[in-house]
Amino acid sequence: MRILGLDLGTKTLGVAISDEMGWTAQGIETIKIDEAGGDFGLSRLSEIVSQYGTDKIVLGFPKNMNGTVGPRGEASQSFAKVLENTYNVPVVLWDERLSTMAAEKMLISADVSRQKRKKVIDKMAAVMILQGYLDSLN
């Protein structure tokens, strides 16, 4: 069972995958997207889903700190429907509050340069989202 973890932004989509046992999450890549133009990187995502035999997707669901759903959360809900219809696999919306900030802090503490952080932050956030979900199962 392989589970895909995604962190949706307006310009990038962070991608992570679980190991076959569903214990650990590893970052795969950051896909460039254009949310405003309707390009969500589905062609590349289709290759990844096929390559890993994905049977579930965990999508980061950004809520406001008070638990309400704002514009980014609504965008994630819409994208979840697209994913379900495109790949015919269940999509779990996972509370991702502060995941990008936590990923940034981890990269800063590892002394990763600002330029390198920009390239991997969304992939790291996807790892944290997926790992949080996997930990909740085990």
Swiss-Prot record:
First-level EC class: hydrolase
GO cellular component annotations of the record: cytosol
GO biological process, one term: rRNA 5'-end processing
Localization, UniProt: Cytoplasm
Repressor as UniProt keyword: no
InterPro entries: RNaseH-like_sf, YqgF, YqgF/RNaseH-like_dom, YqgF/RNaseH-like_dom_sf
Major site of localization recorded for this protein: cytoplasm
Domain of life: Bacteria
Pfam families in the record: RuvX (PF03652)
UniProt-listed Gene3D superfamilies: YqgF/RNase H-like domain
Presence of the UniProt keyword Hydrolase in the record: yes
Keywords: Cytoplasm, Hydrolase, Nuclease, Ribosome biogenesis
EC number(s) recorded for this UniProt protein: 3.1.-.-
Any one GO molecular-function label of the UniProt entry: nuclease activity
Family: Belongs to the YqgF nuclease family.
Known function: Could be a nuclease involved in processing of the 5'-end of pre-16S rRNA.
Name the UniProt record assigns to this protein: Putative pre-16S rRNA nuclease
Organism: Bacillus pumilus (strain SAFR-032)
